[in-house]
Regions:
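Amphipathic alpha-helical segments of the small helical/lid subdomains adjacent to P-loop NTPase cores
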Residues: 51-58, 65-132
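Extended alpha-helical interface modules used as scaffolds for assembling large macromolecular complexes
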Residues: 62, 123-328, 335-337
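Substrate-engagement module of ASCE P-loop NTPases
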Residues: 18-40, 338-341
């Protein structure tokens, strides 16, 4: 496993450093070409695919199997393999967590399944997280914690990228397969780093729809984003979401909105220039995280966000407007009949 990616990705917009790093890597990989008579078989993984100037230009005898459907199961664990080879471990985990066998299987699937490397392929479980879960007999964000994606966050902020769009993006095979240091599109980097995967495919136009593969990646990545976008430090960040959820569950909407407002304090000039996108990104992060513990429907359009948030006992219908008053937002809720679907619901409506 040759992880060349990090130094190059951390200097993605420094062309001089990119050239230096490529010139270091090319002779390293070139040895595989000159010594191919002594190598019967080699499998290279963890290698980033860059466009224009490749570190493999001297190594033309490689076969790229990244999106070859014959090899989709080569670097992960299938559900069938879990039940064939790891059945005892599943039952031991269920016992340790006081869960049924069925509940344990569903939780494993939710947390660690979902990787698709070509269209219409079988879902693959993350082997690192899966095996660590069995070894420790407890669920955890094992893969995510091996490397925090600071360079991806900097790339997203550098390109002023819409996080909602990132989590629901559409692209083609050429974009997925090559990272261009001159491009402002962060999606190929995020995809090749394992934080996005193929969710759907349109064969007519050759378009892939991407998304987060599973809960470990989605919650870990979005939670990691919070202190980079909102006015909250990294230590307090996990507790802020916990407080959010409690306030929502108990109907303490005054505290909820005060906490939300505090996230926008001390906004920098750079952020003010991209104010609408910044607000949308913070809302996306907050309600994405709250949505792991409550039911959230989130829609965004030019200058406004519609939100329905449901708990066991309460329903919140919200309208956020960038340029407008609270009265106008409330009038929009009334005029558009946003609360109508809940008219016969027994829960308290805000």
């Amino acid at each position: 496993s040759l992880h060349d990616a990090l130094p190059i990705l951390q200097n993605l917009h420094d062309e001089d450093m990119q050239d230096q790093l490529r010139n270091m890597l090319k002779p390293f990989y070139g040895v595989l070409k000159t010594m191919d008579g002594a190598i019967r078989f080699a499998l290279l993984t963890g290698v980033t695919k860059f466009g224009k100037v490749s570190v493999f230009s001297d190594l033309n005898n490689l076969m790229d199997i990244s999106m070859d459907d014959r090899y989709v199961e080569i670097c992960g664990i299938t559900e069938k393999e879990i039940h064939t080879c790891l059945e005892d471990e599943v039952r031991e985990l269920a016992g340790a967590q006081d869960m049924t066998y069925e509940e344990t299987c569903l939780r494993l699937k939710e947390c660690y399944d979902g990787y698709h490397f070509v269209e219409n392929s079988i879902g693959m479980y993350n082997p690192f997280s899966l095996l660590n879960t069995f070894a420790r007999r407890k669920f955890g964000d094992y893969w995510f914690e091996t490397g925090r994606p600071s360079y991806l966050v900097e790339l997203l902020k550098h390109t002023h990228y819409d996080l909602y769009e990132m989590a629901n993006t559409e692209t083609d095979v050429d974009v997925l397969n090559s990272i261009d240091s001159a491009s402002i599109n962060p999606v190929p980097v995020i995809y090749q780093s394992g934080y996005l995967t193929i969710k759907d495919y349109d064969p007519e136009f050759g378009i892939y729809r991407l998304g987060f593969p599973n809960r470990e990646v989605e919650e870990g990545f979005v939670r990691f984003l919070l202190p980079f976008y909102a006015n909250v430090n990294k230590v307090e960040s996990p507790f802020e979401i916990q407080k959010f959820v409690r306030e929502v569950r108990f109907g303490d909407y005054d505290s909820f909105f005060r906490r939300l407002q505090s996230f926008f304090a001390n906004t920098t000039y750079e952020v003010i220039r991209e104010q609408e996108l910044h607000y949308e990104n913070v809302f996306f992060i907050v309600f994405k995280l709250v949505g792991f513990y409550t039911q959230v429907e989130y829609h965004t359009s030019k200058g406004r966000i519609d939100l329905v948030l449901q708990t066991d006992k309460l329903i919140y219908v919200m309208e956020f407007k960038l340029d407008g008053t609270a009265e106008e937002a409330l009038q929009q809720i009334h005029d558009k009949h946003y609360a109508l679907p809940f008219a016969s619901d027994g829960r308290k409506l805000f």
